[in-house]
Amino acid sequence: MHTHTIFVISDGTGITAETFGTAIMAQFDTKSRLVRIPFVDTMDKVHQAVRQINHVAESESHKPIVFTTLVNQDMLDLIESQCKGKVFDMFGTFVRPLELELGQKSLHRVGRFADISESKEYLERMEAINYTLAHDDGQTHQDLTGADVILVGVSRSGKTPTSLYLAMQFGLKVANYPLIPEDFERKQLPPALVPSRKKLFGLTIDPQRLSSIRNERRPDSKYASLVNCRYEVAEAESMMRRSGIPWLSSTTKSIEEIATTILQEVLPQHLGH
């Protein structure tokens, strides 16, 4: 398997270029090492990036691959003319053809988050993250009616990372609540969740996978035993069926896939539907 160094160069955080570049490289059977160089907003920083790329090009057997979202044309020209990597100009690939199609020049705004820190969208996103952190793992029952969605499931089924992803990526207020043995004995949802039943979405997981995850945290405990994990998962799924709660298994799905399914099922308007 070939090994390539992938550089991601941006005048902002580099998140856009990294996400896009990673998705493209996933189509190839090649092992890669990713180097993100964010906030390249001066010519000095461009020269530093070029030196870093060229050093790798001279020390490795394969030419580095460079994904860039630089907006400044002079900086981009310097990268393309002086670096010894294969450069892919992501903005140029899409923005310049769009300028022709739309009949107008792009705004050439530098950085994904330029002038966003005081915007309504940004402030709402920060509020959503704070809400989600405060309502993680059933920490509080207060203001559950303010949640956009409430995730339920057994402990370690993926509720917390999914909640934070939905908050950070979509600005959603997400509470998550663990289903525990006491709930299974009562055969009922936790009382605090009943008024918000329509906002509930369940996560389940393969018992063997759950046991493996729990053993990393509390090895050789009843909590992590396969017998207990089978019991909890079966009871949780039964409870979700009885309560009419939509749910999915997180066993083989990425957080992005889980989040998108939740949006489709519960909040389709956030997908533009």
Swiss-Prot record:
Taxonomy, superkingdom: Bacteria
Pfam (any one): Kinase-PPPase
Enzyme class: transferase
Record-listed E.C. numbers: 2.7.11.33, 2.7.4.28
Molecular-function annotations in GO: ADP binding; ATP binding; phosphotransferase activity, phosphate group as acceptor; protein serine/threonine kinase activity
Residues that, per the record, bind ADP: 153-160
Reactions performed catalytically: [pyruvate, water dikinase] + ADP = [pyruvate, water dikinase]-phosphate + AMP + H(+); [pyruvate, water dikinase]-phosphate + phosphate + H(+) = [pyruvate, water dikinase] + diphosphate
Keywords: Kinase, Nucleotide-binding, Serine/threonine-protein kinase, Transferase
InterPro entries reported for this sequence: Kinase-pyrophosphorylase (IPR005177), PSRP (IPR026530)
Record's function text: Bifunctional serine/threonine kinase and phosphorylase involved in the regulation of the phosphoenolpyruvate synthase (PEPS) by catalyzing its phosphorylation/dephosphorylation.
Record-linked NCBIfam families: PRK05339.1
Family of the protein in this entry: Belongs to the pyruvate, phosphate/water dikinase regulatory protein family. PSRP subfamily.
Name of this chain's protein: Putative phosphoenolpyruvate synthase regulatory protein
Species this protein is from: Delftia acidovorans (strain DSM 14801 / SPH-1)
